[in-house]
A protein has these predicted regions:
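Extreme N-terminal leader/targeting segments of oxidoreductases
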Residues: 1-23, 38-42
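C-terminal accessory subdomains/tails of enzymes that are appended
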Residues: 15, 20, 24, 52, ...
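Core beta-strand elements of the Rossmann-like FAD/NAD(P) dinucleotide-binding domain
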Residues: 19-21, 221-231
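Short hydrophobic core segments
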Residues: 26, 227-237
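Glycine-rich Rossmann-fold phosphate-binding loop(s) that bind the pyrophosphate
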Residues: 28-29, 51
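Glycine-rich FAD pyrophosphate-binding loop
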Residues: 40-60
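Dinucleotide-binding Rossmann-like beta1-alpha1 core, especially the glycine-rich loop
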Residues: 64-154
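A conserved short coil-to-beta-strand element within the FAD-binding core of flavoproteins
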Residues: 196-212
């Protein structure tokens, strides 16, 4: 079994200081993780580092959708939509069928003829592009036209005057952070050295001015290290400019930072069997069924504060509530919200920054040379991470070497994907031994895929891990154990934010589960009593800061409230 553990991290750090790599990737979001896998799977000696936890930035704060971007059709971005739909098909069928699941949406229509025809053409093109991208295979159902009554049967809590009918179409959903962690683990399987919380502080250059490595610091120990590499790929998202500035060149990319927020609502609060796709005056709003919850968003506003911890403001939350309530009956209130989160989009910046048009900036990605030996990639979206990764590695290698060592990731299953169908079929039989009901088994299958037997083996070794968390019974104690032993969590907040997601999916942000989760983590990570108490204190401070930030009206005030809880170092 391939693991991200303390031992694996130490081994990777030792390799980083003792050998020269073909490719060094800076950035452990979905783009950087995808690049690390693409390079390693080509047989290139690869290393990947991130200054924070894996998926700590944008890649754990998305709408959790794998989609073609239906709205981009109306901007005539046919190439982008076709590319995204092709990648959606690959994720659903080959790359990560355990993590990516088809999801129906209703598009409510307000005018009986013109809008239905207009929307039907758009969704019809969407379906056609999807069928072309999947080479004729039907990976999701095609659109259906619904009467008002038919739409309200699927979504009973929509206002009667909010529609005259609807179009039902399909996209897909994914646990974004889990996808990133699985990409990193799969890259390690194919030989990559990977270490989170390693901050690059300098780009090294040889006598010809070519990038040849980096200086970095291990934020867990304070140790400095030098990593040598023939090629460096900057995949740091909203930190693109700061990272390329370390090289001191004139090349590189400019990105526009845009904030998007989501609110999380209990599943029972909205009675429906499908999601909603709503067009707004600036963009779109999704109401997405997600496990025991609804995720509703997003917004699109310029962000000028610190990049590490974007937070929703009270105005952001009101915006989402107001737009959702234009169609929901009964309307949502602040009391219905159990969680919120905010992420930053790294959008390619036009020559002249015009913040009022941030929603018009293309999501298509660009790769460029920063200095010889170092390239940067930015733009794109989660769905097209694999294409971005392939393009970045091809660019870094150059045409001749890229042809000699082509990408293989289009048909490469991630860990947990191979044999997923068989394990899904056997899940009930496998779970009977532990007394797990159908909902629990579905949850486990969708998180671990064909690696589910490994989780069961952990429970066999320690039956107490087969019990649910007392304060968060949707998760087993074994899942917390696995987060530390297999999935790379180094701190308590890593577990709550990117592994069990209670930071955004519980009204107290997981506060009631802190003691139990910390106890399990301490046993795996070897914390003494002082470290255990420090970890709990750090996460409680983070909770308090995030809740305080939500009460602020402006980005500046919210950011100031959030940074009261300092980042973990060591």
């Amino acid at each position: 079994m391939t693991v991200l553990s303390q031992e694996q991290r130490a081994t990777s750090l030792e390799a980083m200081t003792s050998q020269k790599f073909d490719v060094l990737v800076i950035g452990g979001g979905v783009t950087g993780a995808g690049i690390a896998l693409d390079a390693a799977a080509r047989g290139l000696n690869t290393a990947v580092v991130d200054a924070q936890d894996w998926a700590a930035g944008t890649s754990s704060r998305s709408s959790r959708l794998v989609h073609g971007g239906l709205r981009y059709l109306y901007n005539l971005d046919f190439k982008l939509v076709a590319e995204a739909l092709r990648e959606r098909s690959r994720l659903l069928t080959t790359i990560a069928p355990h993590l990516v699941e088809a999801q129906p949406f209703l598009w409510p229509l307000k005018t009986p003829v013109i809008e239905r025809a207009y929307s039907a053409v758009g969704v019809g093109m969407y379906d056609a592009l999807a069928r072309i991208g999947s080479r004729g295979r039907k990976t999701v159902p095609i659109q259906r036209h619904l009467s008002k009554a038919g739409a309200m049967r699927r979504f009973p809590e929509i206002k009667r005057d909010a529609l005259v009918g609807a179009i039902e179409f399909y996209d897909a959903r994914v646990d974004d952070a889990r996808l990133v962690i699985t990409l990193i683990r799969t890259a390690v399987k194919y030989g990559a050295a990977a270490a989170s919380r390693v901050k690059v502080t300098e780009i090294l250059k040889d006598g010809r001015g070519r990038a040849c490595g980096v200086k970095a610091v291990d934020l867990e120990t304070g140790n400095e290290l030098t990593i040598e590499a023939d090629r460096i790929i900057n995949a740091t998202g909203v930190w693109t400019e700061q990272t390329q500035d370390l090289a001191g060149g004139t090349g590189g990319l400019k990105v526009l930072t845009s904030k998007g927020i989501h609110i999380v609502i209990p599943r029972e609060r909205i009675k429906a069997t499908t999601g909603l796709f709503l067009r707004t005056e600036k963009s779109v709003l999704f109401i997405i069924p997600w496990q025991h919850y609804w995720v509703i968003g997003t917004t699109d506003t310029a962000w000028h504060e610190q990049l590490e911890h974007p937070v929703p403001t009270s105005e952001d939350i009101d915006y989402v509530l107001d737009h959702a309530n234009e169609v929901l009956d009964p309307p949502l209130t602040r009391d219905d919200i159990i969680g919120t989160y905010a992420g930053l989009r790294p959008l390619l910046q036009p020559k002249v920054l015009d913040e009022s048009k941030s929603t018009k900036v293309s999501r298509e990605h660009t790769v460029t040379e920063v200095i010889p030996g170092m390239v940067a990639i930015a733009g794109g979206k989660l769905t097209t991470y694999r294409v971005m990764a392939e393009d970045a590695v091809n660019f870094a290698l150059g045409e001749s070497l890229a042809k000699a060592r082509p990408s293989v990731t289009a048909q490469l299953p991630l860990l947990g994907a191979e044999g997923f169908d068989a394990v899904e079929n056997q899940a009930h039989r496998l779970g009977v031994k532990y007394g797990f009901d159908a909902d629990r088994l579905q949850h486990l299958v969708r998180r671990y895929g064909s690696e589910l037997p490994d989780l069961f083996a952990t429970i066999d070794e320690d039956p107490s891990l087969g019990k649910p968390l007392e304060a968060a019974p949707q998760f087993l104690r074994a899942e917390v154990h696995r987060a530390c032993a297999v999935e790379g969590a180094l701190h308590l907040e890593d577990i709550f934010v990117a592994r069990v997601r209670l930071n955004s999916e519980a009204r107290d942000r997981g506060g009631a589960a802190i003691d139990e989760v910390a106890e399990i983590a301490a046993a795996v990570l070897g914390w003494d009593e002082a470290r255990l108490e420090q970890e709990k204190s750090n996460y409680r401070k983070r909770i308090a800061a995030e809740l305080a930030a939500e009460e602020q009206a402006t980005d500046a005030a919210a950011s100031a409230a959030r940074v009261v809880a300092e980042d973990i170092v060591g």
